[in-house]
Protein backbone atom coordinates (compact mmCIF):
# COMPACT_ATOMS: atom_id res chain seq x y z
CA UNK A 1 0.00 0.00 0.00
CA UNK A 2 1.38 3.36 -1.00
CA UNK A 3 1.61 6.37 1.31
CA UNK A 4 -0.73 8.36 -0.91
CA UNK A 5 -3.44 5.71 -0.50
CA UNK A 6 -2.96 5.67 3.26
CA UNK A 7 -3.25 9.46 3.53
CA UNK A 8 -6.66 9.27 1.86
CA UNK A 9 -7.94 7.02 4.68
CA UNK A 10 -9.41 8.24 7.93
CA UNK A 11 -7.62 7.81 11.26
CA UNK A 12 -9.96 5.01 12.38
CA UNK A 13 -9.44 3.13 9.14
CA UNK A 14 -5.66 3.46 9.50
CA UNK A 15 -5.83 2.10 13.07
CA UNK A 16 -7.91 -0.85 11.84
CA UNK A 17 -5.37 -1.51 9.07
CA UNK A 18 -2.53 -1.38 11.64
CA UNK A 19 -4.32 -4.00 13.74
CA UNK A 20 -4.88 -6.23 10.70
CA UNK A 21 -1.28 -5.91 9.53
CA UNK A 22 0.07 -6.56 13.03
CA UNK A 23 -2.02 -9.72 13.26
CA UNK A 24 -0.79 -10.79 9.82
CA UNK A 25 2.81 -10.14 10.89
CA UNK A 26 2.29 -12.33 13.98
CA UNK A 27 0.97 -15.16 11.79
CA UNK A 28 3.84 -14.76 9.32
CA UNK A 29 6.42 -14.86 12.13
CA UNK A 30 4.84 -18.04 13.46
CA UNK A 31 4.88 -19.63 9.99
CA UNK A 32 8.51 -18.59 9.54
CA UNK A 33 9.50 -20.13 12.87
CA UNK A 34 7.83 -23.44 11.96
CA UNK A 35 9.34 -23.47 8.47
CA UNK A 36 6.01 -23.12 6.64
CA UNK A 37 6.61 -19.65 5.19
CA UNK A 38 7.92 -19.88 1.63
CA UNK A 39 8.03 -16.17 0.80
CA UNK A 40 10.05 -14.63 3.63
CA UNK A 41 10.11 -11.23 1.91
CA UNK A 42 6.42 -10.94 2.76
CA UNK A 43 7.35 -10.64 6.44
CA UNK A 44 9.58 -7.63 5.78
CA UNK A 45 6.97 -6.01 3.53
CA UNK A 46 4.35 -6.34 6.23
CA UNK A 47 6.72 -4.89 8.84
CA UNK A 48 7.42 -1.89 6.61
CA UNK A 49 3.71 -1.43 5.93
CA UNK A 50 2.99 -1.26 9.67
CA UNK A 51 5.74 1.34 10.09
CA UNK A 52 4.37 3.36 7.18
CA UNK A 53 0.84 3.21 8.62
CA UNK A 54 2.00 4.32 12.07
CA UNK A 55 4.02 7.20 10.63
CA UNK A 56 1.12 8.52 8.59
CA UNK A 57 -1.26 8.06 11.53
CA UNK A 58 0.97 10.36 13.60
CA UNK A 59 0.93 12.91 10.77
CA UNK A 60 -2.86 12.79 10.59
CA UNK A 61 -3.29 13.15 14.37
CA UNK A 62 -1.21 16.34 14.54
Swiss-Prot record:
Gene3D superfamilies: 1.10.287.310
Highest taxon in the source lineage: Bacteria
GO biological process: translation
Keywords: Ribonucleoprotein, Ribosomal protein
Gene expressing this chain: rpmC
Pfam families the record matches: Ribosomal_L29
A GO cellular-component term linked to this record: cytosolic large ribosomal subunit
Protein name from the UniProt record: Large ribosomal subunit protein uL29
A Gene Ontology molecular function term of the record: structural constituent of ribosome
NCBIfam families in the record: L29 (TIGR00012)
Lineage: Bacteria, Pseudomonadati, Thermodesulfobacteriota, Desulfobacteria, Desulfobacterales
